[in-house]
Amino acid sequence: MLALALYHMRSLPREAARVRRSADESWKELVQVFISFFEKKHIYLYLVFIFLYRLGEGLAMKIAPIFLKDEVAKGGIALSNENYGLIYGTAGTIAFILGSILSGYYISHFGLKKTLFSLVCIFNIPFAVYLLLAIFQPSNLWWIGTGIVFEYFSYGFGFVGITLFMMQQIAPGKYQMAHYAFANSLMNLSVMVPGMLSGKLATA
């Protein structure tokens, strides 16, 4: 890692020297960043879309680990720590990476406009895997693993869509990095808020 760090210190382009600005100038620019963000065409519809895109994930993913490890008598699947780590951690991560890579090829071939609806469906519908696991409570690790790996693959496949949507529809402009950061923050909020409520819903 140290060798890579030294290599990048020498090979990466140097940033141009920054001109020091007063606090008042910096504040005015920050205000302009916010104003220009909300002046973008269709921005409010875009923000609603971004917020809803990962809403299902927020409701499912915070409570899913507890569900998978909880006792069958309490409605869970009763996975051991070893099986949980193997299925949810190792196999799920590999499936996520493969899904992301294939999604990149899919979008580059057909374009984001033609693929966005299918990406929304691919991202959200597989969360029904957890509903099916809760209903049938299978004990067979192959069935459990197949369902979770499928969900993670679909998650990786669909996640690329929302990332590219923010980059192509919201970020372009004078303050593209700041505007992308705003959109990304809202997207993460759509996961955090439902995640806080998911425990209450699960025990209601």
Please identify what each model-predicted range represents:
Residues 39-60, 149:
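Pair of pore-lining "gating" transmembrane helices in MFS-fold secondary transporters
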Residues 98-117, 202-203:
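Helix-to-loop junctions at the C-terminal end of transmembrane segments
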Residues 81-82, 173-183:
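Loop-to-transmembrane helix entry/capping segments in MFS-fold secondary transporters
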Residues 2-17:
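C-terminal membrane-cytosol helix-exit motif in multi-pass small-molecule transporters
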Residues 121-139:
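C-terminal ends and interior cores of transmembrane alpha-helices
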Residues 15-47:
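Juxtamembrane intracellular "pre-TM" segments in multi-pass secondary transporters
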Residues 157-172:
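Intracellular juxtamembrane helix-capping segments at the cytosolic ends
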Residues 53, 62-85:
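Short amphipathic helix-loop junctions that connect adjacent transmembrane helices
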